[in-house]
Amino acid sequence: MTEQHACVSELLARSHRLGADPRNTNYAGGNTSAKGTSTDPVTGGDVELMWVKGSGGDLGTLTADGLAALRLDRLRALEGVYPGVEREDEMVAAFDYCLHGRGGAAPSIDTAMHGLVDAAHVDHLHPDSGIALACAADGEKLTAECFGDTVVWVPWRRPGFQLGLDIAAVKEANPRAIGCVLGGHGITAWGDTAQECERRSLHIIRTAEAFLAERGRAEPFGPLLAGYTGAGPAGRRERAAALAPFIRALASQDRPQVGHFDDSDVVLDFLSRTEHPRLAALGTSCPDHFLRTKVRPLVLDLPPTAPLDEAVARLRQLHAEYREEYAAYYARHAGPDSPAMRGADPAIVLVPGVGMFSFGKDKQTARVAGE
């Protein structure tokens, strides 16, 4: 049995710690990497490698098989043949020719971010606090107020090779920087050791949390909306059980879906506030989230005291409108090479006074969409 490289052991331990706390990143969101020297099995000489979380894996449960191992010399040589942002997808395919040995995971679109940054360890995460800054209209200004020159703003760019070049340039130009906030996306941190990188990631996340708590309003979702607090737990669950078959049928028009229900305090509080219709309609801020949630939820615009048949009729009407709007949204943004639309049904349905219904192909996917 081949002994695991020390860099891999450290990387897995760091990934598990970061991925265990949902404040740090969403399920299967973000990626981590480590660079180190290994032995070329053909020549017996030294070879510089990077181990990075592969496509689709989850930090909290990452294994060695979920890592992609790439030769740094080949990866960095791609900078000389990079054809530009119009052909980003070709670069992801090129990563396969930088792999070291057999097995492991497929490299993700974020691979360049890790390989091009001149640091032994890199974390890229999607924490709520970081996304709040990244997606704010004045995110660049807020980032500077929060961190000074230790965390640098990087304007929105589609994930890919050019974003990796952007972040590498930011690090080189800002020697005091420990990381950056990626506009509309998340955060990236780096360090000379695994411990330093993790410490810096957590510092960015917790500092942003404290900054937002200090600057935020006491009631960010507005005051309570009269008549929207709902019944107690027993009445709420009874209403949820009555609505669930109808809602799942609506969410399964394109293909059968498994449902998950959440009536936690944070969900109920949001749905009891005056701002919830406006904020829900704005949609999801982070692109990594709406891969699972779609761009916005369907929200029942009736109080929990409305008769059941009235609520069901309104849900059917809202669902028809949602499908029409989602198809139009897809048509507006799809390109010639875009994948086919993956259905127009909502993945998230919010019912004031009752809770959140989330949907997916299986139990785990439905639960994660809700998370």
Where do the PLM segments sit?
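Glycine-rich flexible loops
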Residues: 1-371
